[in-house]
């Protein structure tokens, strides 16, 4: 008779010196952990492990974009994939619920969970098993799938089209200048996160302000990089936010006003944003778009962006 598996010990890291313990399981963002801890984007008390003896059988961690901020995102959730089911899933759920109860205030909204996954994860049995095991645990805790996304990369040496002259680009003059354009772009958006903001009861204007204040206001690269696209007569067409986040040069946001969609302006605007970053001598530019946002995905492909990875995001509608 096979003995029942022992109950795991579930606890947070005692300090940054236990990072090696945390890294006994692996994920594609392991190389960022040390710097995240040093800069306050991650804290030992947000980093939890499930242990059987000295064997790590599960781990998770939350992340924040600002030193001293509350947890904004659950971006690490790993299990020992050599374990059989249901043992693997039971450990994962116990780890998730124990850590959540300890880290997040009772009744507060749970931060979104996201994971980077191979682009062919559905065709690769091993990758599919890893992905589906995480999804099952999250669903058991009450989460639902929000969206699957394409992660994209432009690489130095890839040609960027010259400015066609169809549009005139100017710098953003301030918060209101950009928010006033973001709001109409959000109306009718194909972006799942944008749709979720509107479904929560926020107006398009409120959702735009929230996006600006929580993300764009904290970007450390110059606002002089940001561009508003106009027709030669001065009518705004759209905008692009080239920037650098804590890890990579990125196209943080791009949009075309509803009345100007269908004219191919997205190609001109994306090219301008890419040119701004390429002029800084970067070796890559990262971007992402929803799997279902076919027009945006096709625009990135036309400009030579490669789909190197995918991601999925899950959310909890209740605390």
Predicted regions and their residues:
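Conserved donor-binding loop and adjoining core beta-sheet/short helix segment
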Residues: 36-120, 232, 240-249, 257
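Conserved active-site tyrosine of GNAT-family acetyltransferases
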Residues: 134, 138, 300, 305
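Acyl-donor-binding surface of acyltransferase catalytic domains
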Residues: 1, 88-173, 314
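Active-site rim helix/loop that mediates acceptor-substrate recognition in acyltransferases
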Residues: 23-52, 61, 196-231
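A structural microfeature
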Residues: 58, 147-148, 238, 309
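Hydrophobic adenine-recognition pocket in adenosine-nucleotide-binding enzymes
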Residues: 254-256, 289
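Conserved acetyl-CoA-binding loop-helix of GNAT-fold acetyltransferases
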Residues: 85-104, 256, 262-279, 294-302
């Amino acid at each position: 008779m096979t003995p029942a598996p022992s109950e795991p010990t579930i606890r947070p890291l005692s300090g940054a010196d236990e990072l090696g313990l945390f890294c006994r399981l692996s994920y594609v963002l392991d190389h960022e952990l040390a710097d995240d801890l040093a800069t306050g984007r991650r804290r030992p008390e947000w980093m939890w492990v499930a242990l059987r003896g000295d064997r790590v059988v599960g781990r998770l961690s939350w992340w924040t974009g600002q030193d001293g901020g509350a947890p904004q995102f659950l971006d690490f959730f790993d299990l020992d994939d050599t374990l059989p089911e249901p043992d693997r899933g039971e450990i994962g759920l116990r780890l998730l619920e124990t850590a959540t109860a300890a880290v997040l205030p009772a009744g507060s909204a749970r931060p979104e969970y996201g994971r980077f996954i191979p682009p062919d994860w559905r065709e690769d049995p091993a990758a599919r098993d890893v992905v589906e095991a995480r999804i099952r645990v999250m669903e058991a805790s009450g989460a639902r799938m929000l969206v699957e996304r394409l992660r994209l990369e432009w690489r130095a040496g890839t040609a960027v089209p010259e400015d066609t002259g169809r549009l005139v680009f100017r710098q953003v003059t301030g918060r209101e200048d950009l928010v006033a354009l973001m709001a109409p772009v959000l109306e009718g958006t194909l972006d799942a996160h944008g749709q979720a903001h509107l479904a929560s009861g926020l107006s398009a204007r409120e959702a735009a302000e929230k996006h600006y204040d929580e993300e764009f206001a904290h970007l450390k690269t110059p606002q002089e990089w940001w561009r508003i696209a106009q027709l030669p007569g001065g009518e705004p067409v759209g905008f692009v936010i080239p920037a650098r986040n804590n890890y990579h040069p990125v196209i943080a946001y791009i949009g075309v006003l509803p009345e100007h969609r269908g004219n191919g302006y997205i190609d001109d605007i994306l090219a301008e944003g890419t040119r701004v970053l390429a002029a800084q001598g970067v070796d890559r530019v990262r971007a992402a778009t929803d799997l279902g946002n076919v027009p945006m995905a096709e625009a990135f492909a036309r400009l030579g962006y490669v789909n190197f990875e995918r991601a999925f995001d899950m959310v909890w509608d209740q605390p």
